[in-house]
Regions:
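Divalent metal-dependent catalytic cores for phosphoryl transfer on phosphate-bearing substrates
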Residues: 1-121
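Charged phosphate-binding loop/patch that engages nucleotide di/tri-phosphates or the phosphate backbone
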Residues: 128-152
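C-terminal beta-signal and terminal closure region of outer-membrane beta-barrel proteins
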Residues: 122-127
Length: 152
């Protein structure tokens, strides 16, 4: 997809660095980094590992490359204006081998053909799934969907 392989490897290895960390520790890392969570973020602990992960990688590992940090930060929600690296990490996480959901195989095949269409399909699935279960939808996911639809 034209991304930097070294950055992709780094972001790929580190994107879930805080996933198995206790939520209170994640909150501490975010607080110490000066991150104020939105109301939607406060209500969805599943998003915390991405936010705290980017903060941890910056403060504890000393990685300051904004593209890598943003790929980690937005790998769960996406966002408008995603870089190639952000797109790669987002869809790689979404289609990883352990992910099982209705349509997973179709999406995994689509990513081999068209990154944009795969991201749109992933975002569509996420938005429908969350809305169908009465869960909040992060504004960044909606912005990512609209941006991909309008600008590719």
């Amino acid at each position: 997809y034209g991304g930097d392989p070294q950055k992709a490897e780094t972001a790929g290895i580190l994107h879930d660095i805080m996933k198995d960390t206790d939520p209170q520790e994640q909150l501490r890392v975010m607080t110490e980094a000066g991150i104020a969570l939105s109301e939607v973020e406060q209500s969805s602990h599943k998003l915390w590992h991405a936010i705290s992960g980017a903060a941890f990688v910056r403060t504890q590992l000393g990685i300051t490359d904004e593209d890598i940090l943003n790929a980690i930060r937005y790998h769960t929600t996406g966002r408008a204006g995603m870089s190639v690296l952000e797109r790669i990490v987002f869809i790689a996480d979404f289609t990883s081998a352990e992910r099982e959901f209705d349509g997973a195989d179709k999406l995994k095949k689509l990513v081999e053909k068209d990154l944009r269409e795969a991201i749109l399909a992933g975002l569509t699935f996420t938005i429908r799934d969350l809305a169908g279960r009465g869960k909040t939808i992060h504004p960044d996911a909606i912005a990512a969907y609209n941006d991909m639809l309008l600008h590719g």
